[in-house]
Swiss-Prot record:
GO terms for molecular function: rRNA (guanine) methyltransferase activity; rRNA (guanosine-2'-O-)-methyltransferase activity; rRNA (uridine-2'-O-)-methyltransferase activity. It holds the Pfam family Spb1_C. Residues 367-416, 430-534, 549-613 are annotated as: Disordered. This is AdoMet-dependent rRNA methyltransferase spb1. It catalyses: a ribonucleotide in rRNA + S-adenosyl-L-methionine = a 2'-O-methylribonucleotide in rRNA + S-adenosyl-L-homocysteine + H(+). It is found in: Nucleus, Nucleolus. It is an enzyme of class 2 (transferase). Transmembrane segments: none annotated. Keywords: Coiled coil, Methyltransferase, Nucleus, Ribosome biogenesis, rRNA processing, S-adenosyl-L-methionine, Transferase. Its EC number is 2.1.1.-. The gene is spb1. The active site is at K157.
């Protein structure tokens, strides 16, 4: 009988023979070829570093696939025979000498790809071999972080073991994409897999713990047991089959009950041990015997102590209460209030306050109140002066040619002010009407009273009308959704930003004298176009960041008012977000345009040069046609904007009246037949479009079809490049794949043939019927109806 030679556990397979035929130094070359076909990183690389490269098969593949004039460096502990276009040297990748040699060869270049296919000398023990290989991978990763370019690729071989997941976690911190794969040329019996890391993040600093094997592969300590959960929630306890504890193989723990009484952590004992024992030791224990004879130690307590693992929350609580009672009897518990029980209570006698002292305190309180009032008024006056000085510096004085010179600096009317009347104490006199008595006839008084009554009646009727109209509007909104949408649009358009509101909150009194000093600012020279340093500091506050430059708001005095209220600052936060961009744009603008009109409208053009205008009404279409044909000019349209309805006074009018008037109080624009037809055609085209869901469904269908075709194309390319298959097998496999992509024929419907006339009692296929068919008759129809009727009755 012939002796069958063993080929090293199947090492001499087809990849071994192909490597011999192709001239590769090892069968591992096909692993890199298959990885490159899947990820395509060699063609994009100009600098490659191969760690643990002996005998050099990966360097051979890299020299074939990479562009010419590429730099390929291979390093290993074992010597590597020379390879064309490859720089090789012998060194240990964990030493500083290897780093210096690589740096010398690369000079100022960075590696686009780093390969690592190394493994330690195996054969001692699988656990030790796996850890050594994981440690070697981490060392190669450390070397790759020094020489890899940002966005580079790192390919390494890893053994599947308990250290695989920590390695993968480290890779994911340093790379954007991490994938583990096993190429077909890798033997199935081998525990090796290849991890392809793409998109190196290139951080400026890497924590040394990331690349320290002691830290990365450290075993996590078990967390402390949660004894409270075992005691107070025993029904929620889940079994964890983690084996036995070290040195404890019986899983039964017993402890004397005296230790449970004396311990400071009874919950830990109840959660850890199985039994609290009352049994006496050979020498005897007096405390244990006393515990057993106590009145509190009932049979229920003894039964609960026999097996702690089967107890519930109620039994655990009774054991804890029993422990407290026993500790009180033995004197182990000291009550908190016991030490202070014998001490006499100190009673503080409060002497009655003297009458003179009470008067002095009242006077002092009134003086402080008056002082605070004066401080508040002084602060307001200083603030008003400071605002006036800033207005003068910014040339924002009130124009004298429109009759507003009588207004005060704060915008108050100087001719009459209620504040001044209140300060003089004459408000009550004016309100009472006793300033001047005028004789009047009794008839005039009667007439005035009648007028007052009629005015009250009119106000009441107006209020009733308003309330009835509101109820009518609410009923319309409940019935019609279009009315609700119209009201929502109206409310949204009516919203306006009211600016900053004054606040009555008082500031701290520590800034009493600061207001007057801050108000003294040197006046700016008349020719200077910039603010003074004080005003610039004032307008650098956060509250003015969203209001633009000073030149843009010269005519808007109210927009410059500084407010001290926190709520107003929150309202202005929406404007503050846009302030940096606007300030940056204005800083880059040339000085020639600083005096331009701030109200100049923005250019409505898009980036492609087309106007951002959509004509949706027949009136607008007719107007556009007139402008396009030259019948009307822009000045004519501006003139048409001034009509009898432009300045219609609507102040004080009720809402129901305005809603009715707005239907008719507007100019009637002429509409041409061509404009109406154009708008109708436009709406027809819009309505002809499918709805959004249908368009999305069609888009998804097209996208999935394209994805399937791309997938089939890649599979067919892989089959075409497979050297192990013959041409016939390749063509059959590709044809089979492409047949799946062909659109399936619609399912043929079953044709119903009524069994009457020539088809009554027929046994075969009816004449003239092709495809699937089913013969039906009136009896079958009645039976189906009866079945449906019975099923409905059962419900």
């Amino acid at each position: 009988m012939a002796i069958q030679k063993k080929h090293g556990k199947g090492r001499l397979d087809k990849w071994y023979r192909l490597a011999k035929e192709k001239g590769y130094r090892a069968r591992a070359a096909f692993k890199l070829i298959q990885l490159n076909k899947k990820y395509g990183f060699l063609e994009k690389s100009k600098v490659l570093l191969d760690l643990c490269a002996a005998p050099g098969s990966w360097c051979q593949v890299a020299a074939e696939c990479m562009p010419t004039q590429s730099i390929i460096i291979g390093v290993d502990l074992a010597p590597i025979k020379p390879i064309p276009r490859v720089i090789t040297f012998q060194s240990d990748i964990t030493t500083e000498k290897c780093r210096a040699t690589i740096r010398q060869h690369l000079k100022h270049w960075k590696a686009d790809t780093v390969l690592h296919d190394g493994a330690p000398n195996v054969g001692t023990a699988w656990v030790q071999d796996a850890f050594s290989q994981a440690e070697l991978v981490l060392q190669s990763m450390k070397l790759a972080t020094e020489f890899l370019v940002e966005g580079g690729t790192f390919v390494t071989k890893v053994f599947r073991s308990k250290d695989y997941n920590p390695l993968l976690w480290v890779f994911k911190q340093l790379f954007t994409s991490v994938e583990a794969t096993k190429p077909p040329s890798s033997r199935n019996v081998s525990a090796e897999i290849f991890v392809v890391c793409r998109g190196f993040k290139a951080p400026k600093r890497i924590d040394p713990k990331f690349l320290d094997p002691k830290h990365v592969f450290a075993e996590l300590t078990d967390s402390t047991p949660n004894n409270e959960a075992r005691v107070f929630n025993p029904e929620k306890k889940k079994r964890k089959r983690e084996g036995y504890e070290e040195g404890d193989y019986t899983q039964f723990k017993e402890i004397p009950v005296t230790e449970f009484i004396n311990t400071t952590d009874p919950i830990a004992i109840l959660g850890t041990y199985n039994k609290l024992s009352f049994e006496q030791s050979p020498g005897g224990d007096l405390a244990l015997a006393t515990l057993n004879r106590l009145e509190e130690t009932t049979d229920e307590i003894r039964t609960c102590c026999e097996d702690l693992k089967i107890l519930g929350k109620k039994e655990f609580r009774s054991l804890l209460r029993w422990r407290l009672k026993v500790r009180e009897k033995f004197g182990l518990v000291v009550k908190k209030g016991q030490a202070k029980a014998d001490e006499p209570e100190e009673v503080a006698e409060v002497a009655p306050m003297d009458e003179e002292l009470a008067i002095q305190e009242e006077l002092q309180r009134l003086q402080e109140k008056e002082s605070a009032k004066r401080k508040k008024e002084r602060r307001k006056e200083n603030e008003k002066k400071r605002k006036e000085i800033i207005r003068m510096q910014m040339h924002m004085t009130t124009p004298m040619d429109i009759g507003m010179e009588q207004l005060g600096p704060g915008g108050d009317d100087a001719t009459f002010s209620l504040k001044r009347v209140e300060r003089d104490g004459a408000r009550d006199v004016i309100a009472s009407g006793k300033l001047a008595e005028i004789e009047s006839d009794s008839e005039d008084d009667q007439t005035e009273s009648d007028y007052d009554e009629s005015d009250d009646e009119g106000d009441r009727l107006e209020r009733e009308l308003d309330s009835l109209y509101e109820q009518y509007q609410e009923r319309r909104e409940d019935r019609d959704s279009k009315v609700r949408a119209k009201k929502a649009r109206k409310d949204y358009e009516a919203e306006e930003w009211d600016g900053f509101s004054d606040s009555d909150k008082e500031d701290d009194e520590e800034s009493e004298e600061d207001g007057a000093s801050q108000a003294v600012v040197k006046p700016a020279p008349p020719n200077s176009g910039t603010l003074s340093s004080k005003a610039a500091m004032f307008f650098d506050q956060d509250i003015f960041q969203g209001l633009g430059d000073v030149d843009d708001v010269e005519d808007e005095d109210s927009a410059i008012e500084m407010q001290e209220d926190d709520k107003s600052a929150k309202k202005g936060s929406a404007l503050e977000k846009k302030a940096p961009k606007e300030a940056k744009k204005k800083a880059q603008a040339p000085e020639d345009f600083s005096d331009s009109d701030p109200e100049e409208p923005d250019d409505p053009r898009k980036k492609n040069g087309q106007l951002d205008i959509d004509i949706i009404t027949a009136e607008a279409m007719a107007l556009a046609q007139q402008m396009a044909t030259g019948e009307k000019k822009s000045q004519d349209i501006i003139d048409d904007g001034f009509n009898r309805y432009t300045f219609r006074d609507v102040d004080g009018l009720p809402e129901w009246f305005l809603d009715d008037e707005n239907k008719h109080s507007k100019p009637q624009r002429p509409i041409t037949k061509a404009a109406a037809a154009a708008i109708k055609e436009k709406l027809r085209a819009i309505n002809a479009r499918p709805i959004k869901k249908v368009m999305e469904a069609k888009g998804r269908k097209k996208m999935k079809a394209a994805q399937r075709l791309e997938k089939l194309r890649k599979k067919s390319a892989l089959l075409a490049d497979d050297e192990a298959l013959s041409e016939r097998d390749k063509s059959q496999a590709i044809a089979k794949l492409m047949s799946k992509a062909v659109k399936k024929k619609p399912k043929q419907q079953v044709k119903l043939v009524v069994a009457r006339g020539a088809n009554r009692g027929i046994s075969g296929r009816p004449r003239g019927v092709k495809g699937k068919y089913k013969i039906v008759d009136s009896r079958m129809k009645k039976d189906i109806r009866a079945q449906k009727r019975l099923a409905k009755k059962k419900k």
